[in-house]
Amino acid sequence: WIADQLGMDDEQQGHLDRVRPRLWDGMCHQHTIHSQPFSEGRTPGSGQPIGTTAVPVEGGYKVTGKKIFASLSGIADIHNVVAVVEGDPRVRLLGVPAEADGVEIQGDWDPLGMRGTDSRDLILVDAFVPEDHEVLPPGVFDAMVARFPYFYMTLSFTYLGLMRAILDLTGEYLRGEHGVASRRDNHVKQAGWAEMQMIYDKAQSLMYRVLGEASVDPTKPAL
């Protein structure tokens, strides 16, 4: 949807028309899990914000680089990384198959409260990315970041879904559906349940407002 709002030329639209059905089928029907690691640990102002490189080869790209805090590193089927081709300033968004040669997960990850994110280091050394794994046409990622500042808020959908799942499980627990006595009539539990509902409703309302107002090239007052 975001790419459609930016306005595509015929070549870019053709690219989207080709890759979108495969992405949709993979995620919705084959349960393909995508990660999207961006962090590289580079110092701001170093002159090159993206250190991962992509070399065009027959049928796709060879990608080399390192992404830190690569969440879902141990479970993702595809790692969507940003990379640049030498001599071309446009950013590529490339889906690196987890099983491709040259892909390695390094390091330990055992922080209290965040073990489930599995955010280790993703190391890429000449990892082959098929051309149909180029998620967006070259340069469109740049345009989204520059012209659609709401872009990074799309992560909110995942967090809102996690909140909803926690609410559902808590409700089942309070009703005694998991082998414990019902606690739904306990006043302390009722107050806590109400507070959880309010937190969720506020987050959902803000997200719906953003969806209703979001647009390409928003004015400063709109932001």
Model features per residue range: what roles?
Residues T32, Q48-I50, I75-D77, R90, ...:
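A generic structural signal for well-ordered coil/turn residues at beta-strand boundaries
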Residues W1-K66:
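Glycine-rich flavin
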Residues S46, S71-S73, V103-I105, E131-E134:
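Short helix/loop capping segments that flank catalytic or ligand/cofactor-binding pockets
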